[in-house]
């Protein structure tokens, strides 16, 4: 609780004399009220008056006088009982406006779900005296946004360590589990997934029970979700509009883990306002978006997922054919094999197995979404799927079937309602055997398929077309004036395609990928799209030698790539006119120089020059005030501009395999730099003395360099999490105060001349991984290694002179992986190798 209180106290800043409203937002059961109560108990003594108003949502809805009773409580708490005389909400609002300005107060409004409640209880900052603090807890962030709450704190779920402590408090009355119940306790923690409500309920329920009862309870949870948790979470679902409820159920049952944009297209194909819907679900703490590998993915807590699936199943728990969504493989196989399908089913997500009978889809007349997948282990099953037995309901709006086994779609499938078709890696050679005009079809994805030809005159309203890596594709038939609405076209590596001249007429195009096509029409395409809506353009792996100056007319361009264009030596000066360009990829190209005026690309955020032929960076690059990522990996650049420190926004600098000999001191002015990679900089002999001024640096990698020392200023890097010093053959020592880098959680040192590891590293309380390898001259390890209380991985390899490992490592409770190579002793016990 203490770290959470400190995080919230930063927003409160009780020393400040302004009036503040602070929102605490999070999913049901996440501990919002507990946190608010802890802050209230700790800080309310600093205020002249205080009021903790619980259950605002419930009280507001309980009766017509609910709002009035809440106003009366606040006035009574803050004005010594004066609230009892208030006769109506309007009068209460006026009293709150006028009576509270004379006292510095703390007010907690717990579990608010409508802005109207805030209007009646804390309508404006000017209702309150300077120094006052109003804390609002809610599941719905939009309530806070609409009320213009400036400070919003998102409650995070408990870490494993916090969860164990809370559970043990309720189950055993102590901080650690009883040894006999340790395995079962960890199972509870995994099930709860950081949700305090579940942890408290299960801890109290299991308290005093024997081990057999614990095992039975845990087995039951796998089949039947915890009722108390579901009821609490379902309050957020019940408050949704009907269409948002449908979107939520689709995410819980089908779309969890999907790329956000793909999920939006699926939901939109089914008629939902997906962008708004997902935003609302996010604000209600029902879903989250996880950023990974450059994409946003839909995520949701396991218990919220359970809640959604329970809503779908509970009306007919033993009759899955009556469920609106089917996702359990065994139930789907049974429904289809028994021909029990019904009009109740709207969405199915299944995997092809020998037990799937697709004729069973025939009764699902209102099926809007069908998602079929197949694992590589079951590919032989595809051969057994009879083309004649294939049936797709004509109501389908979204059809996704990876590795579809037939050369075209079933003749019985009318597809008049189909909005999106996704059949990547399929055997499809043509979509339909006859000419069907599909006016509703907006998106086709057939990448990696066997497609040979495609008549796009049959899909006049197409918006997205992805045919990337269709190696057999030779012809696209595009009638004149067709595809007026196409915004996305991906023809990457369609090398047998005879002509792409139709691209010149695609007036709505925003995304174009023609990499690997070796185009002759390049200049015409650029010319025809001058002043168009084109935002992303990928001409990678083409035989381009010169770029036309007209490329500077693509004023809306945001992302531009000429990677692997080995014949391209330079860029025209007009490219510097692209005022909205954010990403420029010239990696593996033949580029030898950049325009002197490149600094005019004022919106540029990412510049990739990986393994290009660039030898010199123009000084103008230092004017790129919004540049965040500069990749010089494998470049021939020998030096950075002296004023590189002027690139204020730079957060990642990759100099791996570069010819850099020294780093200008100005680099230490990069206050936003988070990652600095100096791997394989074999000519580098020295690091800047003021490296410690990079106050936000969290990862530093130095590999195969000639550096002789690490500047002591590095110990000032309070946000550094990873420090890797590999094969620095001349490095003899580490800074004495290395232990001052409090945030460090990964330290890896493999340097042959290192003689001593400073004892201060034992102060690194957050260190999780420690590696000391090939330190041939190292004679001793710090005695207090056991003080590294968070250490999980310890790797000691090639330490020729080390014979004893300090016995203190036996104190490391979390150590789960260790490698001690050579002959070493722990507590006098000789070991050859421990893994």
Predicted regions and their residues:
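Surface-exposed helical/coil interface segments that assemble multiprotein signaling complexes
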Residues: 99-101, 126-128, 178-179, 205-247, ...
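Conserved hydrophobic beta-strand positions in leucine-rich repeat
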Residues: 348, 370, 399, 421-423, ...
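The feature encodes a structural signal of leucine-rich repeats
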Residues: 122, 357-358, 385-389, 406-412, ...
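Conserved "Asn-ladder"/turn position within leucine-rich repeats
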Residues: 353, 375, 404, 426, ...
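N-terminal flanking helix/linker immediately upstream of nucleotide/cofactor-binding cores
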Residues: 1-30, 34-43, 54-56, 66, ...
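A conserved switch/coupling segment of P-loop NTPase cores
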Residues: 41-48, 90-158, 362, 496, ...
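Non-catalytic, charged helical/coil tracts that couple and regulate nucleotide-powered enzyme cores
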Residues: 74-87, 130-132, 140-246, 274-276, ...
């Amino acid at each position: 609780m203490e770290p959470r209180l400190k995080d919230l106290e930063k927003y409160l800043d009780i020393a400040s004399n302004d009036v503040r409203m602070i929102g605490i937002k999070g999913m049901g059961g996440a501990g919002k009220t507990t946190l608010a109560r802890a802050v209230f108990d700790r800080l309310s003594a600093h205020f002249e008056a205080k009021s903790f108003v619980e259950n605002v949502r419930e009280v507001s809805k309980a009766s017509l006088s609910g709002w009035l009773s809440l106003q009366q409580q606040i006035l009574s708490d803050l004005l010594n009982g004066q609230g009892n005389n208030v006769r109506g909400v309007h009068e209460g609002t006026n009293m709150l406006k006028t009576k509270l300005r004379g006292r510095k107060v703390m007010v907690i409004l717990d579990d608010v779900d409508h802005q109207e409640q805030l209007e009646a209880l804390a309508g404006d900052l000017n209702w309150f005296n300077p120094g006052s603090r109003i804390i609002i807890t809610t599941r719905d962030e939009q309530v806070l946004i609409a009320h213009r709450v400036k400070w919003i704190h998102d409650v995070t779920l408990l870490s494993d360590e916090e969860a164990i402590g809370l559970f043990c408090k309720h189950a055993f009355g102590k901080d650690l589990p009883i040894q006999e119940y340790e395995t079962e306790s960890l199972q509870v923690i995994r099930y709860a997934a950081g949700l305090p409500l579940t942890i408290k309920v299960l801890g109290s329920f299991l308290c005093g029970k024997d081990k057999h009862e614990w095992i039975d309870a845990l087995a039951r949870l796998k089949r039947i979700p915890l009722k108390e948790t579901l009821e609490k979470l379902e309050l957020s679902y019940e408050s949704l509009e009907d269409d948002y409820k449908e979107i939520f159920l689709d995410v819980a049952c089908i779309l969890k883990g999907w790329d956000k944009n793909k999920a939006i297209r699926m939901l939109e194909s089914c008629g939902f306002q997906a962008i708004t819907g997902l935003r609302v679900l996010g604000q209600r703490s029902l879903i989250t978006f996880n950023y990974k590998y450059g994409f946003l993915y839909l995520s949701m807590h396991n218990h919220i997922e359970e809640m959604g699936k329970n809503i779908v199943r509970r009306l007919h728990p033993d009759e899955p054919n009556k469920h609106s969504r089917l996702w359990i493989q065994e139930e789907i196989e049974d429904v289809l094999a028994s021909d029990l399908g019904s009009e109740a089913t709207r969405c199915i997500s299944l995997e092809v197995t020998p037990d799937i009978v697709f004729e069973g889809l025939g009764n699902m007349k209102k099926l809007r979404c069908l998602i079929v997948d197949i694992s590589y282990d079951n590919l032989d099953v595809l051969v057994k799927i009879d083309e004649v037995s294939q049936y797709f309901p004509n109501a389908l709006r979204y059809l996704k079937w990876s590795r579809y086994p037939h050369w075209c779609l079933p003749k019985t499938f009318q597809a008049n309602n189909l909005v999106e078709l996704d059949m990547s890696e399929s055997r499809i050679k043509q979509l339909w055997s006859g000419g069907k005009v599909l006016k509703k079809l907006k998106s086709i994805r057939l990448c990696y398929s066997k497609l040979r030809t495609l008549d796009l005159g049959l899909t006049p309203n197409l918006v997205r077309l992805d045919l990337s890596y269709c190696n057999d594709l030779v012809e696209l038939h595009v009638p004149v004036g067709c595809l007026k609405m196409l915004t996305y076209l991906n023809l990457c590596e369609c090398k047998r395609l005879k002509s792409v001249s139709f691209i010149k007429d695609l007036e709505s195009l925003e995304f174009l990928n023609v990499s690997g096509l070796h185009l002759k029409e390049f200049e015409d395409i650029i010319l025809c799209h001058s002043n168009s809506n084109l935002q992303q353009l990928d001409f990678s792996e083409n035989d381009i030698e010169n770029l036309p100056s007209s490329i500077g007319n693509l004023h809306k361009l945001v992302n531009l790539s000429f990677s692997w264009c080995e014949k391209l030596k330079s860029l025209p000066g007009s490219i510097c006119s692209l005022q909205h360009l954010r990403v420029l990829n010239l990696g593996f190209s033949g580029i030898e120089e950049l325009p002197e005026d490149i600094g005019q690309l004022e919106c540029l955020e990412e510049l990739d020059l990986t393994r290009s032929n660039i030898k010199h960076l123009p000084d103008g690059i230092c004017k790129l005030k919004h540049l965040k990522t500069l990749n010089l990996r494998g470049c021939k650049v020998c030096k950075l501009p002296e004023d590189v420190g002027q690139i204020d926004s730079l957060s990642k600098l990759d100099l791996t395999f570069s010819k850099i000999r020294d780093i200008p001191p100005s680099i230490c002015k990069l206050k936003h730099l988070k990652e600095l990679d100096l791997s394989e900089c074999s000519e580098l002999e020295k690091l800047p003395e003021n490296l410690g001024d990079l106050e936000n640096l969290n990862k530093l990698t130095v590999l195969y360099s000639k550096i002789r020392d690490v500047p002591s200023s590095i110990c000032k890097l309070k946000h550094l999490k990873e420090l890797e010093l590999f094969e620095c053959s001349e490095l003899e020592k580490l800074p004495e105060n290395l232990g001052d880098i409090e945030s460090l959680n990964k330290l890896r040192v493999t340097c042959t001349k290192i003689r001593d590891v400073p004892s201060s590293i034992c102060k690194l309380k957050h260190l999780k991984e420690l590696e000391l390898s090939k330190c041939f001259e190292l004679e001793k390890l710090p005695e207090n290694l056991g003080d590294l209380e968070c250490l999980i991985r310890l790797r000691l390899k090639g330490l020729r002179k080390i014979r004893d490992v300090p016995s203190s490592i036996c104190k490391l409770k979390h150590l789960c992986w260790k490698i001690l190579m050579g002959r070493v002793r722990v507590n006098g016990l000789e070991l050859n190798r421990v893994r």
